């Protein structure tokens, strides 16, 4: 019996290893084109929370910079997008992106689709469902695509026992959830989802992360 259990565990381990895919295999066009600069497109908001678009737009800059890319500041490009009627990214998500290459010099454009945005004061969480699509301004090809449903845990545990302790935790959680900045929550979501994105020229692992594991195309997780 013990022999069969060991064999089953080995088979399971081999199966899990076989299913793991590298970043080169998952995102081959990222390594082919090697984009250096990214223009962040205004998010496409599919939720009832109207402000989600503006909040989330400002969260994309830092995480992409940390991945080693030159990113055009959303604050700088916003006026240009509005003047060129590009603030509604829906009309560009499948369109020709060469104008952004010609005007800005951007190698790629990052599109985001906000599919859900929910705050739970009692449970203590901010949950965002976002799809990320990076398209080449040169070829129009999708270079990177990933979607995540990420909950930012804002719960507070005082350590006090009994009914009083539970009430204190509930009250503290509600306050902490309300006080958690939406920009902070959005940035944490982006950092987590883009964690397997191949690094750009200014990253320490540029052109060296091909063999690192890529994540699943859709992820669901809770972060602190």
Question: Where are the predicted features?
Answer:
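Positively charged n-region of N-terminal signal peptides that target proteins for export
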Residues: 1-4
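Post-signal peptide N-terminal segment of mature Sec-exported envelope proteins
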Residues: 26-48
């Amino acid at each position: 019996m013990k022999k069969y259990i060991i064999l089953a565990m080995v088979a399971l381990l081999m199966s899990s290893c076989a299913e793991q895919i590298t970043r080169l295999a998952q995102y081959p066009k990222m390594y082919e084109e090697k984009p250096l600069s990214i223009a962040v497109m205004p998010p496409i908001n599919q939720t009832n929370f109207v402000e989600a678009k503006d909040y989330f737009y400002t969260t994309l800059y830092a995480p992409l910079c940390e991945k080693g890319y030159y990113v055009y500041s959303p604050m700088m490009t916003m006026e240009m997008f509005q003047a060129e009627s590009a603030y509604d990214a829906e009309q560009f998500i499948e369109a020709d992106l060469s104008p952004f290459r010609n005007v800005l010099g951007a190698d790629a454009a990052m599109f985001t689709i906000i599919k859900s945005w929910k705050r739970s004061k009692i449970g203590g969480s901010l949950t965002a469902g976002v799809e990320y699509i990076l398209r080449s301004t040169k070829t129009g090809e999708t270079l990177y695509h990933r979607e995540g449903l990420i909950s930012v845990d804002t719960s507070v545990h005082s350590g006090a026992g009994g009914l009083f302790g539970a009430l204190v935790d509930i009250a503290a959680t509600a306050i902490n959830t309300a006080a958690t900045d939406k920009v902070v929550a959005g940035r944490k979501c982006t950092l987590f989802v883009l964690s397997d994105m191949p690094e750009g020229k200014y990253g320490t692992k540029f052109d060296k992360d091909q063999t690192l594991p890529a994540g699943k195309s859709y992820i669901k997780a809770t972060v602190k």
